[in-house]
């Protein structure tokens, strides 16, 4: 046998048969034999083998360039969540249009619509432990946009809030570092040349749970004196309506909207406001 030839003996189960073209190109002759153990084998006589055409290594498929910028599932989920949250807030504002914060009453159908939207937002609360993030989420100035506090019937008449006095904005300033809250309720008296004034209620609070605070009334004043003279007779009634004392649970808060429920079963919806408006 030529020196350039090599004799190989391999068990057939471990040998993949070469193609006829490969055997012809390499000058391979094959013959079958049986070993003393009874196992069949294959003899390959290989001479100088001409190299065949090289195959290109398979490479991983590369997605189109535009595919690289497609949002990942998690990003899409976040986007969908934020969109749903925005839609719910828009729907709530639309439902509150013309309701004057609900203080002077509304139909049961409208109340049910508003409360369903409030509960929807509460179920999507992006801040599940708000008292841990009071500085970031709650500190600052807020304006009341809805409340279940109501001034109806004889109360409204006694307080002169039908025609004589108009109820203006309700602001709340929260100082987290001092654990203080100041509520400012604006009024104007038409009969007194559009006299404007306000009821200011100062309170302190203590965190009790991840969602609740206990509130203590510190003081209350009405300014100017002319407005105090109007409310003097029914001042206790007025204070009882707006007294914040008790516990308050923050059920929803983000950068622009806050919802709370108190121990008297009241609901409060507030939006971020500019302190210069107070």
From Swiss-Prot:
Domain of life according to the entry: Eukaryota
Locations listed in the record: Plastid, Chloroplast
Residue numbers spanned by region Disordered: 54-75
Organelle targeting peptide span: 1-74
GO BP: any one term: plastoquinone biosynthetic process
Assigned protein family: Belongs to the PAP/fibrillin family.
Name under which the protein is recorded: Fibrillin protein 5 homolog
Organism from which the protein derives: Oryza sativa subsp. japonica
Source organism phylogeny: Eukaryota, Viridiplantae, Streptophyta, Embryophyta, Tracheophyta
Gene designation per UniProt: FBN5
């Amino acid at each position: 046998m030529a020196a350039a030839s090599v004799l190989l003996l391999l068990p057939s189960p471990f040998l993949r048969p070469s193609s006829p073209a490969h055997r012809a190109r390499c000058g391979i002759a094959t013959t079958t034999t049986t070993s003393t153990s009874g196992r069949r084998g294959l003899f390959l006589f290989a001479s100088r083998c001409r190299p065949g055409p090289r195959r290109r290594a398979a490479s991983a498929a590369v997605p189109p360039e535009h595919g690289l910028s497609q949002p990942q599932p998690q990003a899409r989920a976040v986007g969908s969540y934020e969109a749903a949250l925005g839609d719910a807030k828009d729907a709530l504002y639309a439902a509150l249009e013309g309701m004057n914060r609900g203080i002077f009453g509304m139909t049961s159908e409208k109340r049910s619509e508003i409360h369903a939207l409030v509960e929807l937002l509460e179920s999507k609360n992006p801040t599940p432990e708000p008292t841990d993030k009071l500085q970031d989420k709650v500190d600052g100035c807020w304006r009341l946009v809805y409340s279940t506090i109501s001034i109806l019937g004889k109360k409204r008449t006694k307080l002169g809030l039908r025609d004589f006095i108009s109820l203006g904005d309700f602001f709340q300033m929260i100082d987290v570092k001092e654990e203080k809250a100041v509520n400012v309720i604006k009024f104007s008296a038409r009969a007194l040349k559009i006299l404007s004034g306000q009821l200011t209620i100062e309170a302190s609070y203590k965190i009790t749970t991840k969602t609740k605070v206990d509130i203590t009334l510190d003081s209350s004043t009405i300014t100017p004196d002319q407005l105090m003279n109007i409310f003097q007779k029914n001042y206790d009634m007025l204070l009882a309506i707006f007294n914040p004392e008790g516990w308050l649970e923050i059920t929803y808060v983000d950068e622009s909207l806050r919802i709370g429920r108190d121990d008297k079963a009241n609901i409060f919806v507030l939006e971020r406001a500019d302190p210069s408006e107070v």
